[in-house]
């Protein structure tokens, strides 16, 4: 198709530079001292600067384990800081995050492992036994299993490693890569719960992520001064992309972590953290409404 100008430079720049990760890194530069993650249950928070440093440590650890472009990193994680780090770290080195439903039974988890053949599995401490059973059932054996978000103080299974030990001593510098990113690179696989059949994976490429972020940013609208709490699991489309990690880290606002929905905590956190957007299913909102009627909280920030 002929143009009235030479579009080759624009096409090259758009296809290789207009990535979700570049948007995130823009926020690291602009808002390095601004909160990116707030975890009320552990009383911890990460700024965009400190988050990026931890993401880089995770990415370097993955590289040390031989993870490279198009390899799969499987995350069976509840909403947690570890999920946020897992959302960004693999794409820094060209790997694909498989966001698995942590509620799956061990047989279904084994099916996902055999189908996707992840090189690394990172999982929440509360599903340790499910992962151990899945390991026994699946044919594919990951090279590393990482126990993360260990608020239960679970013992580390033999042959596994804690997330903290895994990233210990790793460089905070940007990881080196030997490829040029492209907007059509697969960066994320979302897994259905298997409601109508066996669990399946849905591939999302980088431009899917960028356009999903833009859609939410424009529709809400979101800005860097917002604080978002998605009350649903981040492993699915609604949790990840509706005020979850995807648009929030792209626009530069804060994400408040909620591992399991609790109406009272939700209302308390709105006031405490000046939350501007709450996302959830109708059932969540109905429960919030009842709790607010019983014990009114200051929701003026919403």
Show which residues each predicted segment covers.
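Conserved AMP-binding/adenylate-forming core of the ANL superfamily
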Residues: 33-80, 84-88, 105-110, 114, ...
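Conserved AMP-binding A3 loop
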Residues: 45-49, 178-180, 187-211
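Conserved structural elements of the adenylate-forming
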Residues: 52-57, 168, 174, 187, ...
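Structural core segment of the AMP-binding/adenylate-forming
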Residues: 64-65, 92-165
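Conserved ATP-dependent adenylate/AMP-binding module captured primarily in the ANL superfamily
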Residues: 104-134, 168, 210-229, 262-276
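Conserved AMP-binding/adenylation subdomain of ANL enzymes
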Residues: 210-227, 235-277, 283-295
């Amino acid at each position: 198709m002929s143009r009235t100008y030479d579009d080759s430079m624009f096409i090259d720049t758009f296809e290789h530079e207009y990535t979700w990760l570049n948007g995130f890194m823009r926020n690291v530069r602009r808002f390095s001292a601004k909160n990116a993650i707030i975890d009320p249950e552990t009383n911890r928070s990460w700024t965009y600067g400190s988050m990026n440093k931890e993401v880089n440590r995770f990415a370097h650890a993955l590289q040390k384990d031989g993870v490279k472009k198009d390899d799969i990193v499987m995350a069976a994680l509840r909403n947690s800081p570890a999920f946020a780090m897992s959302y960004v770290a693999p794409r820094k080195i060209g790997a694909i995050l498989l966001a698995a439903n942590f509620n799956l039974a061990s047989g279904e988890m084994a099916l996902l492992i055999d189908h996707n053949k992840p090189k690394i599995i990172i999982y929440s401490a509360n599903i340790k036994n499910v992962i151990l059973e899945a390991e026994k059932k699946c044919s594919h054996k990951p090279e590393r299993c990482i126990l993360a978000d260990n608020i239960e103080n679970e013992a580390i299974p033999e042959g596994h490693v804690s997330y903290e030990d895994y990233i210990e001593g790793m460089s905070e510098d940007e990881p080196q890569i030997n490829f040029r990113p492209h907007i059509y690179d697969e960066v994320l696989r979302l897994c259905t719960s298997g409601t109508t059949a066996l669990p399946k994976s849905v591939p999302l490429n980088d431009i899917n992520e960028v356009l999903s972020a833009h859609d939410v940013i424009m529709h809400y609208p979101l800005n860097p001064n917002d604080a978002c709490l998605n009350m649903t699991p981040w492993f699915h489309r609604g949790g990840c992309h509706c005020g979850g990690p995807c648009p929030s880290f792209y626009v530069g606002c804060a994400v408040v972590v909620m591992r399991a929905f609790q109406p009272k905590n939700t209302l308390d956190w709105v006031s405490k953290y000046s939350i501007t957007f709450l996302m959830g299913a109708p059932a969540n909102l109905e429960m919030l409404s009842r709790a607010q009627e019983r014990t009114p909280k200051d929701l003026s920030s919403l």
